[in-house]
Structure formats: structure tokens, C-alpha cells
Amino acid sequence: MNYIDTIKSITPLSLDDIIKTAKQHVPAQYRQTPWNYPGLAHGTAILQDEEQLCCYLASYGEMHQGKLACAFTKFPYLNMDKNIEIIDWGCGQGLASIYFIDNLRQYNLLEKLQKVTLIEPSYAALSRAELHLRQAVGDSVYIETLNYYLPSTVESLKANAIGGIHIEEPICIHLFSNILDIPQIDLKELAYLVSSSGYRHYFVCVGPVNFGNER
């Protein structure tokens, strides 16, 4: 089976399942060094095809999982007393959302999750993220996909940048995973978008260790 068919055979899908499956579908010549696959750019490129997506997960998936584990260590799960929605900014293949959903399931809170919004400029990665989320939550959660860049300081990207969000549930979890350190992102405009509603917001931010980066 190919990657998509394998993922569709796993319900409910977890982050461990995703990483394991991706490693199984790395091209043979890159099995030992998936990070050398052309076009990954050390994990910063906008991915375009299935092999790139699998090689990214095989290269960086476990490291990403470890950083998410640290970020969610003190998450206030006991405060999740109303319906929840997730907005995954620059979601890539949806790893942060999947990790959070894994945790909601462990805390018996998954039934409170009503909506997930996935925002990502790579159509290939966004399609993967939607597939992953659907296998993780089934049809009980509304999944919205938005194929946009985050607010940008680069003129050529502004026309394709997201201009607004629609929050429906009383609790909104914002996930920023390996995205806020990118210098082209307009943090001021992003902050405006996030603060445009009066709902209860929680922010989980994960980034690479870039010494000297003051963002």
C-alpha cells in the first residue's frame, strides 16, 4: 500500500502511527538519510510531493514530537470545560494538531473538540494534514482547510495571505509550530488576527533553537 492507503487503514490515527508510516515510505536510496532528499531545505521548504512529505516526517517527525511534548507539559487540560476548537497556523502535515488530539483522547476530552482549522501554504502538506486529522477524529469534528500563507512582510506573498479567521467555539487553541521564527511573517498583523475575537484563547508555541533569534 502507498502512504495514503496505509494511513486510511489506521483508526484512530496517532502521531506515532504517522511517523512510523512515513519511515516505511521513504524512497529506498534515502532510507538511511531522508534529510538529504532534494528540496527539503533542512525542513524549511514548502513541500510539493508525497516523497518530500514522507522524508520530512522521517527526518524531523520525532524531534518535532519531542518539542511538542515539552510544550504541552503544563497545558491546562482541567480548564477545558467548554467546547473547543483548534487553529493550526502554518500546520504543515498537522503534527501539532494530531499531538494535541492524542492528549485530548488521553484526558477523555476529545468529545469537546468541535472544529479544527488548518492553515498552510503548501497544498500537498495541507492535504496530508486533512487526511491525518480525518483519520484521528472521524466525522465528528468539522475540519476547515485554508490554503494560505500567514500574514507576511513580503509584498509578493500578501495577496495569498490569510486575511481573517472565524472562531465559533468558546475555547480556541492556537498552535504555532516551527513558524513564528520565520522572519517574513508579519507578527503584528498575525497578533491582530488572533485578538479579533472575545473568546477564551490558549496559545501553544513551538520553535527551533535559533540562537540570536529575538522573535
Give the location of each predicted region:
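Conserved SAM/SAH-binding beta-strand->alpha-helix loop
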Residues: S122
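S-adenosyl-L-methionine
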Residues: R128-H166
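Conserved SAM-binding loop of SAM-dependent methyltransferases across substrates and taxa
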Residues: Q93-L110
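A short glycine-rich, Lys/Arg-flanked "PGG" loop and its adjoining helix->strand segment in the class I
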Residues: L187-R200
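Class I SAM-dependent methyltransferase Rossmann-like catalytic core
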Residues: H42-L78
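N-terminal auxiliary segments of SAM/dcSAM-dependent transferases
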Residues: M1-P38
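Conserved beta-strand signature within the Rossmann-like core of class I S-adenosyl-L-methionine
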Residues: Y199-N210
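A short SAM/SAH-binding and catalytic strip from SAM-dependent methyltransferases
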Residues: E169-I185
